[in-house]
Regions:
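Acidic donor-binding segment of Leloir-type glycosyltransferases
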Residues: 30-71
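Glycine-rich, basic loop-to-helix element that forms the pyrophosphate-binding segment
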Residues: 72-89
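Short aromatic/hydrophobic "clamp" motif used to bind/position activated sugar donors
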Residues: 94
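Conserved donor NDP-sugar-binding/catalytic core segment of glycosyltransferases
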Residues: 102, 106-136
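A recurrent flexible, glycine/aromatic-enriched loop bordering the glycosyltransferase active site
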Residues: 147-166, 181-182
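Acidic donor-binding loop at a coil-to-helix junction in glycosyltransferase catalytic cores
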Residues: 182-189
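Active-site donor/metal-binding and catalytic loop motifs
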Residues: 196, 201-236
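Non-catalytic, C-terminal membrane-associated alpha-helical segments of glycosyltransferases
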Residues: 224-228, 239-296
């Protein structure tokens, strides 16, 4: 009887936002893992207006018992699609995963289910050593991916939605800010968690981030993300290093100079960043300079 009540308590919805990525392999892997836990589960995908080819490829997942693919006709962005998934989920615990990931450990789901409670749990992520996405992989591996011990020092600032576990009741109370269409929506969600007094627990339960994004595309996405910070300087200052640097430049009246230096060096910066040996320091200046240019 105790075992049965525990199974009911641990009912899990695995939620995957989809945009132009075939996630059949990921879902089949998660499905096999979930069967081994013996807990009730569902896998729910929400397609954010992908191309026809990707939609057709992912529809095969509807044949799996407990798996649903929901398709939206217009693109809304990651914040909206995660809120939509949380609303559509049937079970009391939610596991959000990005489509370009793959669990590292075979006990991936079990580790999350051991941490069921009134908290958010972040498992982290890592990058394969080899890959052609030089800038994206280098930035991800050296800046974004951090061990749990490091993430615990600033748990809310280190929240990233690529791989996290949350009670549905808490998620629906906090939700993602849908005014962030793409970029820093994770940061805003971390702030909302802190404002609500919800604990964030960081553990070692990573996924591989199997990114396939050339540097030029990553720079376009970076610029879109940086634009999201305009008008949010005060709100996100404690959470975003770029804004703290910008604030320092403002104090020294150096924003216009930084914007000018960015504009005259932009092509040289992009030449380095799209090459095989991109400099992360130059990438940091690229983002800061672009934000300064937007601000003047």
């Amino acid at each position: 009887m105790l075992y049965l009540s525990r199974k009911i308590h641990n009912m899990l919805s695995i939620l995957i936002p989809v945009y132009n990525i075939n996630c059949v392999s990921l879902v089949r892997k998660l499905y096999e893992m979930a069967l081994l836990t013996e807990f009730p589960f569902e896998i729910l995908l929400a397609d954010d207006a992908s191309c026809r080819k990707v939609r057709e490829e992912n529809r095969v997942l509807n044949r799996l018992d407990g798996c649903r693919v929901l398709e939206l006709e217009t693109n809304h962005g990651p914040a909206f699609i995660r809120n939509y998934l949380g609303e559509q989920a049937r079970y009391p615990y939610l596991l959000f995963l990005d489509t370009d990931t793959s669990p590292v450990g075979e006990d991936f789901l079990s580790l999350y289910l051991k941490n069921v409670g009134g908290q958010v749990v972040c498992g982290g992520f890592c990058y394969p050593e080899e890959g052609d996405s030089f800038l994206r992989n280098k930035y991800g591996a050296q800046v974004e991916a951090q061990p749990a011990a490091e993430r615990r020092k600033h748990p809310y600032q280190h929240f990233i939605s690529m791989n996290f576990f949350i009670p549905r009741e808490l998620f629906l109370r906090v939700r993602f800010d849908e005014t962030f269409h793409l970029g820093y929506e994770d940061t805003a969600f971390g702030k909302r968690l802190e404002d609500a007094g919800i604990q964030v627990l960081h553990i070692e339960n990573p996924v591989w981030h199997l990114v396939e994004e050339d540097a030029a595309s990553f720079l376009v996405k970076t610029r879109r993300s940086v634009k999201n910070l305009l008008g949010r300087e005060r709100e996100l200052l404690p959470y975003v290093r770029l804004l703290r640097w910008y604030n320092s430049l403002k104090r020294f009246h150096a924003v216009a100079l930084t914007a000018f230096l960015f504009r005259i060096s932009e092509s040289l910066l992009e030449k380095n960043l799209t090459g095989k040996h991109p400099s992360l320091r130059l990438f940091a200046f690229y983002k800061l300079g672009y934000f300064c240019w937007l601000s003047v």
